[in-house]
Amino acid sequence: MPASGGKTAPPPGSGPGGPVRLTWVQPEDLVGHEFRQAAEDGRGETAEPLLRVWLAAGGHLAPARAGASPTPAPPELRALATDLLTALAALPTPAEPAARPDPAGHGAARAPGSSGRPLAPGRGGAGTRTEAGSGVGGRARFAGPRADAAGDGPALRRRLEAAWLGRAVGCVLGKPVEKLPLHGIRALARAAGNWPLGDWFTERGVPPEVLAAHPWNRRSAPTSLAENIDGTPEDDDLNYPLLGLLLLQRHGKGFTTADVGRLWLDELPAGRTFTAERVAYRNLLQGLEPPATATHHNPFREWIGALIRADVHGWTNPGAPAAAAAQAHRDAALTHTGNGAHAAAFVAAATATAATGRADVHTALRAGLAVVPPRSRLAEAVRFGIRAAADVRDTAAGFDTVVDLLHARYGRYHWVHSVPNTAVIAAALTHADGDFTHSVCRAVSGGWDTDSNGATAGALAGLIAGSPDAIPHRWTAPLKNRLATTVPGFDGIGFDTLAHLTAQEAARS
């Protein structure tokens, strides 16, 4: 995500004495992103007259990579942006094809712009019904009995520790190059003799002109290069699994979407949220209820934020991909709809399958796809990524070809959108075929949201590895079994302790 610990660079004028200029919430920036979302979800033609009004008034398109445009809009332009956001929300959205009907009826989806009434308090076991925002993704159904959770006890705890470690490794690996374009990532790694990517990024040996052309993520480089990693730095890709664990400790697997919102208000600093999460947080403070928190003036509702919250739902439902997907959808409904929620369900189901200790990575990915509407944009992208990765030889050079294909096909999306990022995660895991190092390195070398992709791929690859000892020491040693976070009660915690706490929640009914 764009991302951790306030990683998004502040716009000019936002330093001491300047305006606050909070990112990801300014109407003049949100409306540009909503026009982009409209083009993606089938409203582009009907939105065109509104776009002409916006541009004629002096408005701009969405910032390509930053969270805010360089300067604030004048009051009249900001008011117009707010009005246009409301008008865009009223445009009918062509629905994507629905998932196949399922008698259990988990996770019935809700269309964009639907009523802001609170979600029905679903109880997330098999045979129950939960509601989640769907955007344009059609009706997502999560069905099936809970499978026997193989390997409970010590074996499950070892897998969970490997998953937590894998998530941390992949996240930290991707942090220095987050927001960089693909050619910049490749240039930095090649200059260090680290391409194909196989180790931590480093500044050692990189010529000054390369560093000047492709500067590291300025917030992450001091804590995430090979020469300075000293424990696991804070990141939203690690904060959200902690919050998910806290959610389950307080409310159990029957939590409601409203429970998620209350937990955030109690325990999550607003400044540690980004994109859809920040907009939803603002909506909560304005008195809106889910699912309106996910839809009201939230152009980021199909981005990657719900996906990075999904692992804990899979970890705590080993062998029960349907239940994991239903939990993830209920969590996602606070902030995301459509493909954003589908991505969370995909990861949760794949993770739950891998958590048994009996499935290979390809079986896990198939389980993830089984809970996604098969004709949604997300399912199409994941299938494309898997096919592309399966069609090339299992070498890093071959994966460069896969990445080039993905960027050619999905480069129109924002770099934080769920569709391209889920595709590259699936492609990386497929190509790596269960190898931990290859999984995280392929995911990060694919570009886009590098720390989120590395984290998700690393978590699933850790489960497949089955034990912390199966992850190469060069990855785990610098993290020192220590995680920094602003989530209360967790700062400095070890991954072994997190595995124990997660296993306790997995054992709860």
Enumerate the predicted regions with their spans.
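Surface-exposed loop and adjacent secondary-structure segments within mature catalytic domains
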Residues: L182, R190, W195, V206, ...
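Aromatic-rich carbohydrate-recognition surfaces in CAZymes
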Residues: A221-V260, W264-T273
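Accessory "access/gating" subregions that flank catalytic or transport cores
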Residues: G107, R139-D152, E277-I304, I308-A324, ...
